[in-house]
């Protein structure tokens, strides 16, 4: 019902049909093999035999006595069916490998060892291995059924030695059957060995993934030889069993050793020879070759195979078209240095998406039953004709915030969130709050000027409970819509968002599924009711496309008047020849995924091929899922399109508005930066030495404990001009420092990828996905992020002001440390937030730190801080130049809102009857945002008191030290009073 309502019923039927089909097919095959094997053994039953007798130390055990051939066949049928069903259930779990094998695609590139298209390894080889494993199990079942049945039917008679005498007898018919089964099993073993040869091309070694010199020149040839030996050994043993009279029981088991050796000479010599040859060829020869030939000349002998690994890795991870350039960065800030980077400077994002989430909640949550993601999203929107970096979040439903929890409220009244909230990425109000351009309840602002805008959020990451919606025409609405007046507005869901449960059968079904009898008896469930469940966007996409690996971040976008959740889907493989294997979970961990509940790393699994082949959207109102083929050149998604025809929309169907919000996904970028830290090196010899390997820096804004655990700095979305781009581009960025444990952290590279897909219907922007790498010279002394953070911390002026900000009941939070290639060098920008210790407090942007080389700027605005490090005039105006400007408009907006209705204005201030001028804090005196004379004096007094304290402590004058400390406390209290 759920899949049918979404229009993805083919997914469940194809998957279910394939799994059941494989299970039944394999169950029938293994049952048939077992039955045929047993039937042949029954047919070969000796005429005079009545079962088999086993004597153990004088005790007689009779097996199969008085069992007729007809009864034996019946027993064989039952046992073979049971075995078939058990093993068939294990085989059906690999349904995807079978489907991909029969729908394989060509990659158009060949592996460098065998010259076979890479599609064979990705699609066909896994299926062949599965089939050969199944065949091996079938043949093993055949020989087991044969031996057991022959024992039961008297074809094999065993007498355990008594006083040194025993007997082992196998009839001629039994020997023929067992010999044939043995040969077939050995042939299957040989075939598996041959298939295993191809797996060497994805074998993980100590340095690279793929076949190295020893593998190519020893292991692979030896494997073919051993496969031939295995097949020959099977023929020898099979023929010996069929023709030898030794097994007819003419001699006792405990005969003299010489006689036994003579009788069993052929199998003994054959097996012993095979073991010796195997040890020499598969163990000794590769070890000796590696030890005495390869290791002393490793760089020369491995270079060919390292180059194969480099080329394959860059191709498999989409790194073969990286635009790299040398960037001779300066560390001397000159006046006017940013004049040529004015557009990039104006777009520098100051709002940290993780730190400001509490601010969003405090200013825009409105009621306790709403919430926002703990890490808001970064996107871009055209506001008044200008592209703006934006922080955006959906106002989701949070049932945990309800005071009165019961079934009616949880499942029929509080059913949805309401609207999105968006703020400029580089602007704040005079008191440090985000400057919203979309906010409030009902929603108002720049994004919702559509005639039919739909703000209701029925489907979201936080919607974990099911909801029952819908009512007959004319019925009074009971769904709570949004707070207004004394009771709030109500609404009735009008979409097609879930299975209908109007009939008693559906109600009973879902009552059982959710363990709730209320679904059966509640009057809220009616003929028009729908049940909404599995409401997380990521969960919905995962169910309709279970073969995709989904990005750890889901973000909202306002598209054509509706709120859409955008989910990035990846096609992956672990079978691309010579490409380096990567743990996707480890590669995508960073400080954000470690601390956030709404952003996660990819699931831990090994892969050596990845593409962002699919973009999925989930409508926040009706939950409809749309899958779009994003990378049309990817053979893997082509295979899935063939398996599930009609499931995907083509690129041409993406609207211009939706296209403008498609961005380069973070998880893919993190995997690529992990690989590029080594694979920016294109020379095999240089790669072997490892002297130019890099690493992603740890996040210097995290605690010391987190840094010791190597929690990496996340990538950041920024609009900037870099690496040969002709104009500023919305990009995803990161940086590199030298690999290893050196304490000298300098910047070695700056990585960015163009993330703007454009805004043309059905056409991806020409530069989208272009990866740009700016490599710094080896003698560069540009500080890395960690060193830049240390420079901030070591600055006496910065420390002094931060100490003042942290006094009393406030604390300082450092925002994301951004790295930007500006002014001929690298500029570091870090917003500084101040938060009081109250339970309802929230961070406010108060200061901005800037570093260029070893120079540090610290001011109320980015504009001022940039001027400090660039000779008093940076030559460009940052986007926050007006952040300390007049707040008259803010106050007027606040006055115009209806405080009794709990509305919020687009500048972010929640109205209350006692605060009609819209202020929520900040300096109540000077509205221009400049420091008042009294505040300057208080700060100067505090600074002087600190100097007096230091001087007194050095002299050991503790009385004077106590007086200075008292004066310091008084000055700080005065400063705090003036600042509030």
Show the residue positions of the predicted features.
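Soluble extracytoplasmic regions of secretory-pathway and membrane proteins
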Residues: 1-5, 9-955, 959-964, 968-979
């Amino acid at each position: 019902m759920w899949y049918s309502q979404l229009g993805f019923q083919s997914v469940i039927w194809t998957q279910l049909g394939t799994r059941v089909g494989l299970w039944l097919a394999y169950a029938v095959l293994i049952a048939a093999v077992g039955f045929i094997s047993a039937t042949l053994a029954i047919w070969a039953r000796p005429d005079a035999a009545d079962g088999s007798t086993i004597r153990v130390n004088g005790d007689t055990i009779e097996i199969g006595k008085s069992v007729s051939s007809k009864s034996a066949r019946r027993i064989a049928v039952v046992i073979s069916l049971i075995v078939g069903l058990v093993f068939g259930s294990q085989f059906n779990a690999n349904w995807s490998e079978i489907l991909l094998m029969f729908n394989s695609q060509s990659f158009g590139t060949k592996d460098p060892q065998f010259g076979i298209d890479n599609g064979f390894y990705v699609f066909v080889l896994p299926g062949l291995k599965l089939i050969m494993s199944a065949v091996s199990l079938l043949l093993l079942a055949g020989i087991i059924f044969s031996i057991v049945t022959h024992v039961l039917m008297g074809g094999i008679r065993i007498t355990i030695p008594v006083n040194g005498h025993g007997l082992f007898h196998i009839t001629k018919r039994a020997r023929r059957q067992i010999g044939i089964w043995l040969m077939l099993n050995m042939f299957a073993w040989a075939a598996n060995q041959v298939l295993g040869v191809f797996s060497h091309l994805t074998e993980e070694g100590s340095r690279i993934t793929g076949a190295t010199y020893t593998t190519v020149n020893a292991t692979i040839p030896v494997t073919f030889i051993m496969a031939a030996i295995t097949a020959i050994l099977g023929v020898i043993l099979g023929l010996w069993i069929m023709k030898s009279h030794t097994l007819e029981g003419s001699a006792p088991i405990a005969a003299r050793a010489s006689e036994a050796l003579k009788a069993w000479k052929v199998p003994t010599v054959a097996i012993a020879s095979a073991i010796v040859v195997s040890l020499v060829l598969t163990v000794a020869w590769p070890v000796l070759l590696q030890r005495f030939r390869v290791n002393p000349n490793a760089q020369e002998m491995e270079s060919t195979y390292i180059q194969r690994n480099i080329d394959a890795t860059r191709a498999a991870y989409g790194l073969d078209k990286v635009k790299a350039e040398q960037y001779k960065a300066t560390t001397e800030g000159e006046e006017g240095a940013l004049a040529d980077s004015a557009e990039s400077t104006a777009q520098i994002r100051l709002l940290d998406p993780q730190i400001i989430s509490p601010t969003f909640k405090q200013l825009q949550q409105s009621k306790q039953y709403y919430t926002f993601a703990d890490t808001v999203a970064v996107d871009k929107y055209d506001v008044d004709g200008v592209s703006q970096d934006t922080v955006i979040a959906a106002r989701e439903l949070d049932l945990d915030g309800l005071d009165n929890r019961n079934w009616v409220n949880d499942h029929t009244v509080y059913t949805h969130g309401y609207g999105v909230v968006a703020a400029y990425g580089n602007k704040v109000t005079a008191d440090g709050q985000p400057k919203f351009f979309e906010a409030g309840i009902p929603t108002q602002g720049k994004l919702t000027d559509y005639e039919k805008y739909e703000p209701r959020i029925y489907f979201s990451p936080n919607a974990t409970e099911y909801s029952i919606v819908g009512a007959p025409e004319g019925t009074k609405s009971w769904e709570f819509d949004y707070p207004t007046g004394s009771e709030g507005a109500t609404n009735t869901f009008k979409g097609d968002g879930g299975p209908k449960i109007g009939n008693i059968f559906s109600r009973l079904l879902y009552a059982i599924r959710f363990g709730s009898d209320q679904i059966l008896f509640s009057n809220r469930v009616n003929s028009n009711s729908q049940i909404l469940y599995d409401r997380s966007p990521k969960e919905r996409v995962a169910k309709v496309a279970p073969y995709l690996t989904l990005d750890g971040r889901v973000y909202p976008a306002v598209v054509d008047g509706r709120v859409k959740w955008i989910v990035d889907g990846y096609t992956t493989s672990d079978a691309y020849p010579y490409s380096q294997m990567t743990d996707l979970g480890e590669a995508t961990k960073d400080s954000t995924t470690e601390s956030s509940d709404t952003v996660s790393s990819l699931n831990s699994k090994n892969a050596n091929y990845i593409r962002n082949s699919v973009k999925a959207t989930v409508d926040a109102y009706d939950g409809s899922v749309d899958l779009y083929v994003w990378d049309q050149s990817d053979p893997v998604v082509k295979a899935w399109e063939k398996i599930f025809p009609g499931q995907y929309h083509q690129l041409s169907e993406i609207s211009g508005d939706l296209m403008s919000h498609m961005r380069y996904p973070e998880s893919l970028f993190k995997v690529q930066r992990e690989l590029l830290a080594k694979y920016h090196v294109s020379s095999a010899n240089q790669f072997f030495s490892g002297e130019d390997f890099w690493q992603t820096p740890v996040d210097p804004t995290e605690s010391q404990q987190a840094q010791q655990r190597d929690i990496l700095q996340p990538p950041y979305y920024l609009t900037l001009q870099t690496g040969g781009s002709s104009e500023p581009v919305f990009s995803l960025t990161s940086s590199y420092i030298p690999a290893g444990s050196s304490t000298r952290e300098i910047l070695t590279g700056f990585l960015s990828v163009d993330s703007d897909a454009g805004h043309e219907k059905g056409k991806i922007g020409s530069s989208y996905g272009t990866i740009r790498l700016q490599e710094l010279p080896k003698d560069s002394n540009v500080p890395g992020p960690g060193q830049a953070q240390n420079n901030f911390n070591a600055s006496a002026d910065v420390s002094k002001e931060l100490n003042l900000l942290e006094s009393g009941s406030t604390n300082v939070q450092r925002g994301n440390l951004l790295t930007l290639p500006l002014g001929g060098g690298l500029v570091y920008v870090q917003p500084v937030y101040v938060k009081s210790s109250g339970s309802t407090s929230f961070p406010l942007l108060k200061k901005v730190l800037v570093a260029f080389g070893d120079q540090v700027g610290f001011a109320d605005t980015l504009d001022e801080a940039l001027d400090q490090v660039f000779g008093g005039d940076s030559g460009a105006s940052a986007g926050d130049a007006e952040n300390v400007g007049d707040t008259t408009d803010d106050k007027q907006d606040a006055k115009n809102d209806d405080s009794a209705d709990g509305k919020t204005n687009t500048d972010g201030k929640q109205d209350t009857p006692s605060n009609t001028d819209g202020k929520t804090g900040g300096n109540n005196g000077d509205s221009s945002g400049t420091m008042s004379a009294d505040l300057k004096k208080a700060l100067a007094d505090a600074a002087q008191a600190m100097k007096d304290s230091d001087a007194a402590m050095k002299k050991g004058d503790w009385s004077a030290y106590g007086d200075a400390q008292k004066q310091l406390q008084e000055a700080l209290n005065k400063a705090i009073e003036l600042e509030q």
